[in-house]
C-alpha cells in the first residue's frame, strides 16, 4: 500500500482536488457547477504553465527560483511591444524568445559553469527583476490593446483560446515524458547523473533544455497574466516561483529528481488555486491564502518524508529478513534414549 501511494502520487493529488471540490458543495450547492470548474481553471492557467516548466527542471535534480522574475520581465516586454505598435503575434513570439533565452542562460550557469542551481537562479532572480524595473522605471504598463484580452475570452465550453493551448501543452508534455526516449532522459539525468552519462545521455544538454523550456513556459505565463488583467503592475510575477515549486511537490515531483509525472504537477497547481476559491466561498480574508497553502505544503512534505522512511525500513526488512530469522528450535532428547545412556 505504501509503495502504491509513493508511485502514484498523482492519484492522491486527484483525490485531494475532488474532495476540495465536493466538500464546499455541502455549504453551497451552486459551487458544484461547470462554471466553478472553468473559473478555477482560468485562474490556474498561470500556475499550471509554471508548474510544467518547473517539473522539467526538478526532474533533472535542479531547481529554478527565477521563473517569477522571468514571467514579470516577459510580460513587461509584451506590453512595451504592443504599446509601441507591434502586432500581437510579433510581440508574443518576441516574448517567448526572451523567456527561452533567460532560461537558456540559467541552464548555462548550472550545466556548463557548474554553479549550484539554487545559487545561480537566486542571482538571475534579481537580475531579471532589475531589468524589468529598468525597462518600466518602476511604473505600471497600461493601455494594452483589446485584442490581447481576447486571448483569455471564453471560446469553447467556457474555455479561452489560451486555455485550450494550455491543455494541448499538458497533453503533449505528458506524452513526451512518458513515451519518448528524449523525455525519459530527464528522469535518467535526475536519478543517476553518472549512470546517465555512461548510457550516452548528454546530461548537460538535457539540463540546459530543461531550464530553457522552463523559461519559455514562464514567458507564456506572462502572456496569460497580461491577457487576463489587461495591464502589467511593476511587481508582476513576485512569489510565483515558490507556488510553482509547491505545486510540483504537492503533485509528487521529487525534490531529489528522477521521479514524478506532469499530471501530478498540474493537479498540484489546480489544488493550490482551488484553495483560493474555497476561501472566497468561506468568506475568509485573502491574506490567509498563503498561510493555508504553506500549511498544506508542509503537511505534504512531512507526509512524503514519513512515507519515504517507512518504505526504506520495509525494503531493509525484506532485504535482511533471512539473516534475522530465529534459529529452529532444538528438539529435546526422548526419554528412551536417556535410559539407554544411563
From Swiss-Prot:
Belongs to the binding-protein-dependent transport system permease family. AraH/RbsC subfamily. It is found in: Cell inner membrane. GO terms for molecular function: transmembrane transporter activity. Residues 1-13, 60-69, 114, 176-212, 273-283 are periplasmic. The chain crosses the membrane at residues 14-34, 39-59, 70-90, 93-113, 115-135, 155-175, 213-233, 252-272, 284-304. It comes from the Bacteria. Keywords: Cell inner membrane, Cell membrane, Membrane, Transmembrane, Transmembrane helix, Transport. It holds the Pfam family BPD_transp_2. The complex is composed of two ATP-binding proteins (LsrA), two transmembrane proteins (LsrC and LsrD) and a solute-binding protein (LsrB). It is a multi-pass membrane protein. InterPro entries: ABC_transp_permease. GO terms for cellular component: plasma membrane. Part of the ABC transporter complex LsrABCD involved in autoinducer 2 (AI-2) import. Probably responsible for the translocation of the substrate across the membrane. This is Autoinducer 2 import system permease protein LsrC. The keyword Nucleotide-binding does not apply. Residues 35-38, 91-92, 136-154, 234-251, 305-342 are cytoplasmic.
